[in-house]
Structure formats: C-alpha cells, structure tokens
Amino acid sequence: VMGRDAGYIALWCGLANGAEQVLIPEKYDFDEQKIVNNIIANRKRGKRHYIIINAEGIGHSTSLARRIEAATGMETRATILGHMQRGGSPTCKDRVYASTMGAYAVDLLCEGKSNRVVGFSHGEFKDFDINEALGMNKGVSDYMIKVAKDMSK
C-alpha cells in the first residue's frame, strides 16, 4: 500500500482486514524467516491464508511474495493496490469532510489567503502553510501497532 515514509495507511489496512503481518517503516522489525515460520505454523493449524500488508517504503512486495513461495512451497500472490486504494466509494464522513474542507478553502481565498492547505487535526478543521503541510507526517500509534500484533495471533 502507499506509504513510502509512513506506515499509517498500512497499519489501518492491517487492522481493518485482520492481516497477520504489517510491515511499516516506523517500526521495521522485519524478519523474513520468522514470517515464513509463522506461515508454515498457521498452515499446520489449518489456516488457509496469511495476509501481509506492506507499506511501499519497506520494499518490493512482489519479490517478497516470490521468496515466501519458494520457502514455503505455497502459492503466494502480491497485490499492488497503487491508486486503486483511493478509488472506493466515498462514505458519508468522506463527503462531509470534503464539503467542509472545500468551503474552508473558499473562505480562505475570500480572505485573501493563499498557499494554504486545509486539513482535519485533533478534532477540528484547520489550515496550514503549504510548506509546513508538506513537511508533516502522520505518525503511527505504538498502541495500534500492539493491537495489530495481538489481533494477528
């Protein structure tokens, strides 16, 4: 999934989809042999799938899938979502946020302000200088990482 420098999207995808492994740049503790061992152990317990969410900053999913297939002898597929992950139908929340952020941006322009980015932070809509916004990174929560690991067992 997208996430060259940040694993926020990967972590949320992993939690939402019950992934067994989430690989993110912020907490890179990647041990390929451990993953292979877990896949084999899960298969022996009757589990028929093992989902790994890989943030793009970690490396190539396709080559990882090939190495896992070679090590386990099990059919393995890599799915590169790319821009497809942006293409879902908007939720009610998406539509409300888009309308509110669009109105906020128009208000800024009417006030003579430009080079601003509108976002949602800490429960409210805010605007930021464009250069400041480009330097921001949405961090991941250590607790969410723990939950993802606990849920994958």
Predicted regions and their residues:
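Accessory alpha-helical/coil subdomains and C-terminal extensions
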Residues: 1-75, 81
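Short glycine- and Lys/Arg-enriched binding-loop motifs that mark or flank ligand-binding interfaces
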Residues: 3, 78, 84, 98, ...
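A broad detector of short, well-ordered amphipathic alpha-helices
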Residues: 8, 12, 96, 100-103
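Short, hinge-like loop/turn segments at secondary-structure boundaries
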Residues: 40-42, 95-96, 135-136
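Short active-site-adjacent structural elements
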Residues: 61-63, 86-89, 124-129
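Catalytic, metal-anchored helix/loop core of enzyme active sites in primary metabolism
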Residues: 67, 74, 84-99, 106-110
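Conserved catalytic/coupling modules of large nucleotide/cofactor-utilizing molecular machines
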Residues: 92, 100, 104, 108-120, ...
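Phosphate-binding loop/pocket of nucleotide- and phosphate-handling active sites
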Residues: 116-153
